[in-house]
Amino acid sequence: MQIQNIDHIVLTVANIEKTIEFYTRILGFQLVTFGDNRKALTFGNQKINLHQKGHEFEPKAKHPTAGSADLCFISATDIHNVLEELKQKNIEIIEGIVDRTGALGKIKSVYFRDPDQNLIEISNYLS
């Protein structure tokens, strides 16, 4: 077996509307409605399906929990501009700009939390 990439992930959230508002307003993701009024967020060629806590679609994670994710997104925007934009949008910065290692090499990152307290990392790969 040879796995090529991740098709989508699922976030279990306490409030789908708050999650949609955050990810579309703060990160510029697009809202997609599919199937039986299911909601997803897209960016580039990636997709995050949203499950409302207590009303998850089957099959689901064994213990679906809001706020347990730690996600790293690579931005085309310079990390210094990312940090400034987050501050302008009144997002509390947990840490940044810091050196980290991503899947393809060294990155510079900024950390903050979404409405469910998931840890969100926005990064740039170093040239």
Where are these predicted regions, by residue range?
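Low-complexity, polar-biased intrinsically disordered regions enriched in Pro/Ser/Thr/Gly
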Residues: F57, G102-A103
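Short, basic/aromatic recognition patches
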Residues: I94-G102
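Minor-groove-contacting beta-hairpin "wing" of winged helix-turn-helix DNA-binding domains
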Residues: K39-T42
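Low-complexity, intrinsically disordered Gly/Pro/Thr-rich segments
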Residues: I97, I107-S109
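Residue-level "edge-of-site" marker
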Residues: D36-N37, D99
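Short, small/polar residue-rich loop motifs at catalytic or cofactor-binding pockets
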Residues: G35, L104-I107
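Glyoxalase I/VOC metalloenzyme domain signal
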Residues: M1-I6, T12-L31, G44-E95, R113-S127
